[in-house]
From Swiss-Prot:
Protein name, per record: Multidrug resistance protein MdtB
UniProt KW keywords: Cell inner membrane, Cell membrane, Membrane, Transmembrane, Transmembrane helix, Transport
Keyword match rRNA-binding: no
InterPro entries hit by this protein: AcrB_DN_DC_subdom, Acrflvin-R, Multidrug-R_MdtB
Length: 1040
């Protein structure tokens, strides 16, 4: 069956050419809708691709990691494990803290996940320890997601406990209410409390125990219902002085009588106003501070959330005393806005470059204005559809629009060039517009739908990568569709009204020079093409070699996942020996902070020491380093990290791990480095056997750097081995022993002070200043059956052992996470393969499993689907072209151009030192759509010449190549210049945009040269093949 062109009647463009007012108003409506839509589009760094994630934190001061695991974490995990839609569950149990992170499937709404988590916590309540100070608290937040904003609250006139109290009640609560905020944490929070430090010798001399004191305090401070009196005429509410509010009141509390004389709490203890947890501390630029970290909910718009916080900050700070200073240390939206601004500038630059190349070729202002109108109209009209689809203005959608500048102008160029050709031959503009638009209409439709077909596989990519690029693909597809509509409606109408034979022939010296140059180039191309057609097998050999080279380059090119961005914020972990105390860690962080703040690129620094939901152990500290803006420093973030690590390396007893924050966060736990690999077993003993072996093996690999693990099993522990028979004979139970130890060393929260604004705790502990270390255990006394006191040493033997500092689970089983970076000269693909090879070499047993986590796991998934993604794009394009041409052969001819694009893109990436990451892969997929345009324009005209003019296939393709050479060159250069600003970008977020530009520019340069010669040769080869098939199988002879 023969494909007939629309003819000279104008085809689908006829109505719009003949009704210019209606066409103008229709385009004005598209423009207006786009302008209005733009005003409603939110701004973000990337599309919303967050997994629904919820963190559950349970604090149990004084509990060991083993107790936290068995008594708190395990019961919660059993209930959470029954929830539907749960993708992954990880937990970390350390001294006094249990953190369970729940990651759900992408398709599950966060609110539904929240309901399931709340129900699971309720079901586990009866299984948890009865003396938990607070029930488990959940937050709709991913702990690995860096804070969107960090504020430091300092004062040179008030104690930190008072500052913390004001910040918690007046500032943090209000910020928590902002839409999009998932969690506000107060790092180093010195919450006010009454601290009771018992003098062990004093209570022993009086025959008392710490349990006697605890019972007296809890009985003296209550706040419960008392009822009311309801008389015949009046009702009276009952109240009492059952609450004690200050340290002075507790100091005067009578806890016992000795020989008729009262023993007050102040006689046997130091009672003072202090902090609830004395092992927490935070610093901002080395000054003690309350550091407020604001994290967003998964899926919340970071810009809108930060703007809302900024708007309320002045009002919140006014409620604080003048001596309290609130400083915004970091705001991730600053870099996001700068990145978006840079991308917007590159978009405008791309438009300007495209219009410039149009003028260079057409050398006519009216002819330049026409596609110059089509470009912004197509891009602006896209905004209206983006609003409807709940998209945002982000780096990826702006990159799509930047690339689209080269795409959307193609259709207009093809139409203008064809109409101009008829006007130059002497036809009237209206007739030329009708004839030229009708002739080219099928080509426009072919170009449009075949290009959109390339994007279809992107829409069906699964998991987070598919969600990430859905907005990119749809935005680009919408721009291309609008461009096709504009090119078939507005462009021919404007050509009929604005172009004339006189205007096209009007030339100045520059125009004549350009014309002579183009004539010489076309003539040279014609001579070269004639030689190529005379030596087809040599050309086919080049095409085949190109295919082989593409495969070879694909194999050898370094592969990565997502470009490492320079967002101006570095997250760090400071690691010390496992037996380090809070005091020693505080000293170490001061030394490290001093070195870091000396770096010229560093603007501010916050550090935190202590155990809470973010920091698992006392021997580690968290750091956040805020760099100066990119234009105010000389080095990129990786260079700064290297310099800082070198500066800190000379400090004994510490290891500093640093990594830049990223806009794309896939992990569910804060890691020391960028990539993670887990080793999981059914028991801790199995882990303890294999972790050192695997860690040593990984540390020896050149493809990995800064290898570390969270396995810490050498923490000092005092094992109290109770002689149960002796204890039973004295009437002492194990509960008595645990209570005595907890009272002395657990910073036990024994009572609550209620106020109108907040609640504060009474903390009980032994004053160990005079008896540090294990000697403090000798001061513990217990009450025996006869009422006397017995030293702990009488019934127990104290042993010093090693114990884990934290116990980690993944889906309820023990796990260790190895963290690593990739050194310069290697790629993530190299590192992954090296780890897999090492795993095979070690021959791990069946009950030991390994798995990559976070971005490394996503890299594996993306790498595995990349080849199929490209194959799917090619198949989709073949189907679309086959349907349009009603031919099995012609689509193959068109698709034969694709290897040239791959060679150019891969070579350009290798030369530029870039990895083949998912951004570059998107560029290659787009190249598939661009490069085949050349072949479509050639083949369309060759088929028309054969059909309408009776030309031979050789003459037809030769003429088509010469006639379409100029529009092919124009459209290719337009696409190249559209991608050029991305390739040359140097501003904020350039790391994200550059791979796309490099791949496209390299692919276009190589393919432009090769396809102009290989396509006509392959066209003739398949024509002869078609004739051969028809002669051998006449029953199946095609009509096309």
């Amino acid at each position: 069956m023969q494909v007939l062109p629309p003819g000279s009647t104008g085809g689908p463009s006829r109505l719009f050419i003949l009704r210019p007012v209606a066409t103008t108003l229709l385009m004005a409506a598209i423009l207006l809708a786009g302008i209005i839509g733009y005003r409603f589009l939110p701004v973000a760094a990337l599309p919303e691709v967050d997994y629904p994630t919820i963190q559950v934190v349970t604090l149990y001061p004084g509990a060991s990691p083993d107790v936290m695991t068995s008594a708190v974490t395990a019961p919660l995990e059993r209930q959470f494990g029954q929830m539907s839609g749960l993708k992954q569950m990880s937990s970390q149990s350390s001294g006094g803290a249990s953190v369970v992170t729940l990651q759900f499937q992408l398709t599950l709404p966060l609110d539904v996940a929240e309901q399931e988590v709340q129900a699971a916590i309720n079901a586990a309540t009866n299984l948890l320890p009865s003396d938990l100070p607070n029930p488990p608290i959940y937050s709709k937040v991913n702990p690995a997601d860096p804070p969107i904003m960090t504020l430091a609250v300092t004062s040179n006139a008030m104690p930190m406990t008072q500052v913390e109290d004001m910040v918690e009640t007046r500032v943090a609560q209000k910020i928590s209410q902002v839409s999009g905020v998932g969690l506000v944490t107060l790092a180093g929070g010195q919450r006010p409390a009454v601290r009771v430090k018992l003098n062990a010798q004093a209570i022993a001399a009086l025959g008392l125990t710490s349990e006697t004191v605890r019972t007296a305090i809890t009985g003296a401070n209550v706040n419960s219902a008392k009822g009311s009196l309801d008389g015949p005429e009046r009702a009276v509410t009952l109240s009492a002085n059952d609450q004690m509010q200050s340290a002075d009141e507790y100091r005067r509390l009578i806890i016992a009588y000795q020989n008729g004389a009262p023993v007050r709490l102040g006689d046997v203890a130091t009672v003072e106003q202090g902090a609830e947890n004395s092992w927490l501390g935070a610093w901002a630029n080395q000054a003690p501070a309350i550091v407020m970290n604001v994290q967003r909910q998964p899926g919340a718009n970071i810009i809108a959330t930060a703007d809302s916080i900024r708007q309320m900050l002045p009002q919140l700070t006014e409620s604080l005393p003048k001596s309290v200073k609130v400083t915004v240390l970091s705001d991730r939206t600053t870099n996001i806005r700068a990145s978006v601004r840079d991308t917007q500038f590159e978009l405008m630059l791309a438009i300007a470059l495209v219009v410039m190349i149009i003028y260079l070729f057409l050398r006519n202002i009216p002819a330049t204005i026409i596609p110059g109108v089509a470009v912004p109209l197509s891009l602006i009209g896209t905004f209206a559809v983006m609003v409807f689809l709940d998209f945002s203005i982000n780096n990826l959608t702006l990159m799509a629009l930047t690339i689209a500048t080269g795409f959307v102008v193609d259709d207009a160029i093809v139409v203008i060039e064809n109409i101009s050709r008829y006007i130059e031959k002497g036809e009237k503009p209206l007739a030329a517009a009708l004839k030229g638009a009708g002739e080219i209409g099928f080509t426009i439709i072919s170009l449009t739908f075949s290009l959109i077909a390339v994007l279809i596989p992107l829409l069906f990519m699964g998991d987070i990568v598919g969600r990430l690029f859905r907005e990119f693909a749809v935005t680009l597809a919408v721009a291309i569709l609008i461009s096709a509509v504009v090119s078939l409606t507005l462009t021919p109408m404007m050509c009929a009204r604005m172009l004339s034979q006189q205007s096209l022939r009007k030339q100045n010296r520059f125009s004549r020079a350009c014309e002579r140059m183009f004539d010489r180039v076309i003539a040279s191309y014609g001579r070269g093409l004639a030689k190529v057609l005379n030596h087809p097998w040599l050309t086919l050999s080049v095409a085949f070699a190109t295919l082989l080279l593409s495969v070879m380059l694909w194999i050898v090119i370094p592969k990565g996942f997502f470009p490492v961005q320079d967002n101006g914020i570095i997250q760090g972990t400071l690691q010390a020996p496992q037996s380090s105390s809070y005091a020693s860690m505080a000293q170490r962080q001061r030394q490290v902070a001093e070195r870091i703040l000396q770096d010229p690129a560093v603007q501010s620094l916050t550090t935190f020491v202590g155990v809470d939901g973010a920091n698992p152990t006392l021997n580690s500290a968290r750091l956040q380093i805020n760099l100066k803006p990119l234009d105010a420093r000389d080095d990129r973030v990786q260079q700064v990290i290297s310099r800082l690590q070198t500066a800190v390396a000379t400090i004994p007893g510490v290891a500093l791990y640093l990594q830049p924050t990223q806009d794309l966060t896939i992990d569910t736990q804060v890691s020391r480095t960028q990539y993670q690999f887990t080793l999981q077993a059914t028991t801790l003993d199995a882990l303890s056997h294999w972790v050192p072996k695997l860690q040593n093996a990984l540390q020896s690999l050149p493809q990995l750097s800064e290898v570390s693990s969270d396995w810490q099993d050498r923490g000092l522990a005092a094992w109290v081995n109770v002689d149960r028979d002796s204890a039973s004979r004295l009437g002492i139970s194990m509960a008595d022993v645990d209570n005595a130890l907890y009272n002395a060393f657990g910073q036990r929260l024994i009572s609550t002070i209620y106020t109108q604004a907040n609640q504060y705790r009474v903390v009980l502990e032994h004053n160990t200043a005079s008896t540090p270390g294990l000697a403090a255990l000798e001061t513990i006394r217990l009450t025996s059956r006869d009422g006397g006191t017995v030293p702990l040493s009488a019934i127990a033997r104290i042993e010093q052992r090693f114990a884990p500092l934290s116990i980690n689970h993944l889906d309820q089983f023990p796990v260790t996470t190895f963290s690593f970076n990739v050194p310069e000269g290697y790629s993530l693909g190299d590192a992954v393969q090296a780890i897999l090879d090492t795993e095979k070499t070690l021959a791990l047993p069946a009950d030991i499993t390994t798995q990559f986590q976070g971005s490394t796991l996503a890299f594996q998934a993306a790498l595995g689907s990349t080849v199929w993604l490209i194959v799917a794009a090619v198949v989709a394009m073949y189907i679309v072209l086959g349907v349009l041409y009603e031919s099995f052969i012609h689509p193959i001819t068109i698709l034969s151009t694709l290897p040239t694009a791959g060679v150019g893109a891969l070579l350009a990436l290798i030369i530029a030192g870039s990895e083949l990451d998912i951004i570059a892969i998107i560029g290659i997929i787009l190249l598939i759509g661009i490069v085949k345009k050349n072949a479509i324009m050639m083949i369309d005209f060759a088929l028309a010449a054969e059909r309408e003019q009776g030309m031979s296939p050789r003459d037809a393709i030769f003429q088509a190549c010469l006639l379409r050479f100029r529009p092919i060159l124009m459209t290719t250069l337009a696409a190249l210049l559209g991608a050029l600003p991305l390739m040359l970008s140097t501003g904020v977020g350039a790391e994200l945009r550059r791979p796309l530009g490099i791949a496209m520019v390299g692919g276009l340069l190589v393919s432009q040269v090769l396809t102009l010669f290989t396509t006509p040769v392959i066209y003739l080869l398949f024509d002869r093949l078609s004739l051969y098939v028809k002669s051998r199988f006449p029953r199946h002879k095609e009509e096309a």
